[in-house]
């Protein structure tokens, strides 16, 4: 029986997942269009606080948090209050879960 090393298949499987994740990420133009379409831009900007926090500040606060994507996606969908002050963020039930996840993933890539 011929034995083959297992590491190449593990490496290429991992590379496939990374490539798919990179493919799913929004580019800046698509993300900004989604911000406008979904109404996020009424309260948020990339680099300055409007009513809600700047997206760069959100990315900095949650940097390194492995649960940030899931937790923030949930807050965007259901709304929240108290994390960035007492002005509530309304729920965004009209935005699809996939769009929310893509937008939050993009936000988490931003740097100051």
Protein language model features and the residues they cover:
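N-terminal export/targeting leaders of redox proteins
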Residues: 1-29, 111-112
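Sequence/structural segment immediately N-terminal to covalent heme-attachment motifs in c-type
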Residues: 26-46
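Axial heme c-ligation environment in periplasmic c-type cytochrome domains
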Residues: 42, 48-62, 75-104
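Short microdomains enriched in Cys/His and/or Lys/Arg
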Residues: 61-71
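Short, low-complexity, Pro/Ser/Thr/Gly-rich segments in the mature regions of secreted, periplasmic
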Residues: 105-111
């Amino acid at each position: 029986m011929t034995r083959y090393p297992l590491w190449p298949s593990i490496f290429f499987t991992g590379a496939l997942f990374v490539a798919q994740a990179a493919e799913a990420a929004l580019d800046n133009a698509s993300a900004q269009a989604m911000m406008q379409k979904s109404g996020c831009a009424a309260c948020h900007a990339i680099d300055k606080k409007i009513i809600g926090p700047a997206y760069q500040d959100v990315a900095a606060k949650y940097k390194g948090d492995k649960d940030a994507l899931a937790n923030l996606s949930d807050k965007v969908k259901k709304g929240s209050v108290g994390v960035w002050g007492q002005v509530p963020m309304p729920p965004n039930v009209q935005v699809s879960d996939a769009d929310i996840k893509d937008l939050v993933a993009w936000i988490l890539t931003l740097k100051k």
